[in-house]
């Protein structure tokens, strides 16, 4: 499982590392992951464009991004917190899958989504997907 940095997932960025520290929970890794997920879901505005334009750091700074860039930010924060996390790709959509005691599908692009339980109201498909260590487009 992966916690490493990739092209748009800037795990080694000092600002991302410092920011991720603020989400650590004394209740454990699952609560830390939920804290990170809900912050991204509630604070990063969705923008509609194709592919990646920003990466994790710029998405954090601008507080906006499409599904790819929101996935980059969420993966970077989770990996920085030591949580192995994959990118998931379904029909025309990307989201994240942190692996703690099991795999949790986490899509921060809509405030109706819950940690580990995204719905399909954006037109993507969370039921048919593939997992990836990186997203490089």
Positions of the model-derived regions?
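Secondary-structure boundary elements
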Residues: 2-65
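Hydrophobic/aromatic-rich core segments of domains that either
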Residues: 69-136
